[in-house]
Amino acid sequence: LLLNSIVNASISPENLYITWGVFVISTSLSYLYSAQSVILTADQNVYLVKLITGLTRSLAYILQIFLMICGVSFWIVCAIELLSNVIQLILFNKLTLKKYPQLVKLDITDTINKENIISVKTKIKREIKYTFVHKIAGVVVFNTDYLIISVFLGITVITSFSSYMMLIQALAFLISAIASPLGAYIGAKLYSDSKEKVIRIISLYNSLFFMLGIFCAYMFYISSSTFVSLWMGKEIVLSQQLVLLLSVNCFVLIARISFDVAKVGLGYMSDIELPLLEAIINIIVSLVLVHYLGLNGIVIGTIVSNIIVVMILKPVFLYKNALKSDNAFIIHELIRSWFFISIFLLSIFFITRAKVIVSNEWLDFFIQVCMSSITPLLLLIMIYSVFYSNVRKFMFVMFKKNYREN
């Protein structure tokens, strides 16, 4: 009954509930190999985790798209998702047994005493509870928009909205995959270097991901509508005003990666009130504004929760509670981040007027995207290099390293 009320469309109960059940089982299977992925990540082998998950998911997506184009039954398409997780489970089990055969014969009671076992179990249970709250709140935050759109605006609006969101999520997924090893690096530095050096590293990462988020958000704003038009047709294209709002969410989704990576590296998951607050703000503001602004109001609800929680409270909690930084440093970090964003927006609007790309051919579109990316990229590098010595030193080291290799 709940699914029928949420999905405002004429779909038979069999198709609705069986499809839902398949995806629930598929998601549940992913938890069966979570322990193996944790072991590999902790042992600095996160690239193996990303290799397995990346390859299987990519192949599954390609096969699903091909089958849908060929008009194959949707049940088979759903089965591919299930098969993908089964293959990942098999691969993770085989890889873990091959790399760590001692785990099969290991008796943990021989290595640590009972008091330590109880202490470790208590800590693990606490962290699992915190992580569970984070995951549940994350599911609510990232799926609230779709539910509210389905209930109040109809399922047809989701097609246009999801087309743009898929581009944003694809960017975030790619960048997250690249950034995931940084968590293990921060964790290693926490035990080998001083707290001040760890703070400088995290501050550098925040600046770099802010740069990346600003760049991706700008490129999304000027190119996403043309991409969607060429891909799915002009009737799917959203207004440029709404695309601007989605660009803000694109920026936040990428910029927040640095905070999430730092939290994993520091082992800090105690801020369970933040994701709950983010979900509550998102739901309340979206439910209120959808009656006045429609789809724009729902997106604004997400922006409000993102800015308050993700861009302000999350870094404050991270620096203050996990790194024990003083208030002056935290305020300085926040002001500097937003100062760079303001300088970039004023400069790019003055130079390019944020002209939206218009094209009727794929080749011409990609050429325009490449050409339009040069100015904002150079501008970002110049702004951060001039105003932030940490980024300037990093770029100098990278340039010097590449020069020596060549």
Describe the function of each predicted region.
Residues 124-128, 162, 194-223, 240-243, ...:
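Interfacial transmembrane-helix starts/ends
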Residues 4-8, 66-71, 132-135, 139-170, ...:
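Helix-terminus/linker motif at the lipid-water interface of multi-pass membrane proteins
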Residues 41-42, 100, 105, 164, ...:
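Helix-loop junctions and terminal segments of transmembrane helices
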Residues 2-23, 220-251, 323, 358-363:
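Interfacial segments at transmembrane-helix termini and the short loops linking adjacent helices
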Residues 78, 90-142, 185, 193-200, ...:
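Interhelical loop/hinge segments that connect adjacent transmembrane helices in multipass membrane
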Residues 74-79, 119-127, 149-169, 197-200, ...:
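Interfacial/gating helices of multi-pass transporter permease domains
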Residues 22-41, 49-64, 77-93, 134, ...:
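Short runs within selected transmembrane alpha-helices of multi-pass transporters and secretion channels
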Residues 105-108, 321-326, 332, 348-406:
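Membrane-proximal transmembrane or re-entrant/amphipathic helices at the cytosolic face
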